[in-house]
């Protein structure tokens, strides 16, 4: 997602690229995010949906509890787990782990659960709190393409998201 901050991974060789693609395909990559959502979530949860492109709104996904697709739509399974990190008056800060990798997965699933991401105009409407959605790719754990050891990369929250949390505290 364009406005999502945080980690992006790149490979320097074709072999490393192939190894990373395999890890993503086999769901061996641990992808961790931080999200600020509107409302108060349960302490933890697991969201399981089938996501499809919304034919009525270009660039948006829709969530369904079953794999039955509307005509011309291809449902993709999405699994998201979250744990509450901090509660604010009208918002909740979450640590999120995705087990799959579908476009807009976190944004769409949290909105479908009734907890849209703060600042997310596509899935949550207007939010005066910030100019972009509060979703940050905080950590990524992979197997090194050559050495095979597990490596964890982390990215701290950027200044605008830290400032948003300071305003809420």
Please state what every model-predicted region is.
Residues 2-169:
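RNA pseudouridine synthases
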């Amino acid at each position: 997602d364009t406005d999502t901050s945080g980690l992006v991974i790149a490979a320097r060789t074709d072999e490393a690229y192939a190894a990373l693609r395999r890890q993503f395909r086999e769901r061996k990559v641990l992808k961790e995010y931080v999200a600020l959502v509107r409302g108060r979530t349960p302490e933890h949860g697991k969201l399981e949906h089938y996501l499809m492109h919304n034919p009525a709104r270009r660039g948006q996904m829709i969530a369904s509890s079953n794999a039955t697709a509307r005509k011309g739509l291809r449902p993709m399974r999405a699994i998201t787990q979250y744990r509450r990190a901090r509660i604010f008056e009208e918002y909740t800060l979450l640590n999120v782990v995705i087990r799959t990798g579908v476009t807009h997965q976190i944004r769409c699933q949290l909105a479908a659960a009734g907890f849209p991401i703060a600042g997310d105009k596509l899935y949550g409407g207007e939010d005066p709190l910030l100019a972009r959605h509060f979703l940050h790719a905080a950590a990524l754990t992979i197997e090194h393409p050559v050495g095979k050891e597990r490596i964890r990369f982390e990215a701290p929250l950027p200044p605008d998201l830290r400032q948003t949390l300071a305003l809420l505290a």
